[in-house]
């Protein structure tokens, strides 16, 4: 029975306190009651904490998007994290592309130029996928986790104490209001006693909140170290990817390098197939100062390297008079020409000469 009485009294006291705070808050909003202002230093600390929370959330969320662009995958990882379970490993985009390239190259034939190149590209893409996975793991551990710990831990504590400070401030101002309205000596003495208690509780809560807020500077220093770790992880990732692509470029250049023009050279703009075949001797196609004469003068083009035999892999129908039609399994002579697009070679069969796509050829010697 005594316990029940205590609970009822406590409930009544809590309800009275809540009502008192609500009345004080409403009167302040209506300009009918005075409001105790926090000191400037504490206000600055509160603003700094709020600003830190807002930008930390934005940086954290956008970093998650950067590392995992797939929103469904992010939701799945979030659910597994809340269930305290490890998310199942999933193949990432570079790894999937790499596997497709390897499968395609195997089907086209590793002995063909295109098939060989696809397999090499696929292996490199899979290595990039592994590096991507390592970047995500390292960044999540060294960068995202500390940011999330601040949002879900430190800042929640700050917000809780800030709310308590707000309540203590309302209690203090309500006590001041009651003291002003007190007329009888007994009521005034009681109000003065209440004011001293609420003032003490407010000062104590303000000090607790201030100490917590001053830790924001340490949070910034910690997040700076985490940011350095993130930058280092990105630097390692991009350096790995650059090295992988550099090695791949060397491998791809090893078998057709003598017949591919420099990719940095200006490409020739192909003549559209809709143009008439009969082009005057004065007609020319030019890009950036590079001039290629009409098809009738193709034989006058200067070869930039020796000729070489190539076997045709597939039938090819010329799109216009500058190109040479091909039949599968026939052997033609090919050579490169200064300024020609890297995807093309000059082909020669008897008295016929024209551009041929390199992907349709297998170099023989």
Curated annotation (Swiss-Prot):
The organism named in the record is Homo sapiens
What are the annotated GO cellular component locations? autophagosome membrane; cytoplasm; cytoplasmic vesicle; cytosol; Golgi membrane; membrane; midbody; mitochondrial outer membrane
Q: How is it modified after translation?
A: Phosphorylated at Thr-145 by CDK5; this phosphorylation is required for autophagy induction in starved neurons and facilitates homodimerization.
> Positions of the region Required for membrane binding?
1-37
Q: What is this protein called?
A: Endophilin-B1
The protein's GO terms of the molecular function aspect are: cadherin binding; fatty acid binding; identical protein binding; lysophosphatidic acid acyltransferase activity; phosphatidylinositol 3-kinase activator activity; protein homodimerization activity
Q: In which tissues is it expressed?
A: Highly expressed in heart, skeletal muscle, kidney and placenta. Detected at lower levels in brain, colon, thymus, spleen, liver, small intestine, lung and peripheral blood leukocytes.
Q: Where is the BAR domain?
A: 27-261
| Family label | Belongs to the endophilin family.
């Amino acid at each position: 029975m005594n316990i029940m009485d205590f609970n009822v009294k406590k409930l009544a006291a809590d309800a009275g306190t809540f009502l008192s705070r609500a009345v004080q808050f409403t009167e302040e909003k209506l300009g009918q009651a005075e409001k105790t202002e926090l000191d400037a230093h504490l206000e600055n600390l509160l603003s700094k904490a709020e600003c830190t929370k807002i930008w930390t959330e934005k940086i954290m969320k956008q970093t998650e998007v950067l590392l995992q662009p797939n929103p469904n995958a992010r939701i799945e990882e979030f659910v597994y994290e809340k269930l305290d379970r490890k998310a199942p490993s999933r193949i990432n985009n570079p790894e999937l592309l790499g596997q497709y390239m390897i499968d395609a190259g195997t089907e086209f034939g590793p002995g063909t130029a295109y098939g060989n190149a696809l397999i090499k590209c696929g292996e490199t893409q899979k290595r990039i996928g592994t590096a991507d996975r390592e970047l995500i793991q390292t960044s999540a551990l060294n960068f995202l986790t500390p940011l999330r710990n601040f949002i879900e831990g430190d800042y929640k504590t700050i917000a809780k104490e800030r709310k308590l400070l707000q309540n203590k401030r309302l209690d203090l101002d309500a006590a001041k209001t009651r003291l002003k309205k007190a007329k009888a000596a007994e009521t005034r003495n009681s109000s003065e006693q209440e004011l001293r208690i609420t003032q003490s509780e407010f000062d104590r809560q303000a000090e607790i909140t201030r100490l917590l807020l001053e830790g924001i500077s340490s949070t910034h220093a910690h997040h700076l170290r985490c940011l350095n770790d993130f930058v280092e992880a990105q630097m390692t990732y991009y350096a790995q990817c650059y090295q992988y692509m550099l090695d791949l470029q060397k491998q791809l250049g090893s078998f057709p390098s003598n017949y591919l023009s420099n990719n940095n050279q200006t490409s020739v703009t192909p003549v559209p197939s809709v143009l008439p075949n009969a082009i005057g001797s004065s007609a020319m196609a030019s890009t950036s100062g590079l001039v290629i004469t009409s098809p009738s003068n193709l034989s006058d083009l200067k070869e930039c390297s020796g000729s070489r035999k190539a076997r045709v892999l597939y039938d090819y129908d010329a799109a216009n008079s500058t190109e040479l039609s091909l039949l599968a399994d026939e052997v033609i002579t090919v050579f490169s020409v200064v300024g020609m697009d890297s995807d093309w070679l000059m082909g020669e069969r008897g008295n016929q000469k024209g551009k041929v796509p390199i992907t349709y050829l297998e170099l023989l010697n």
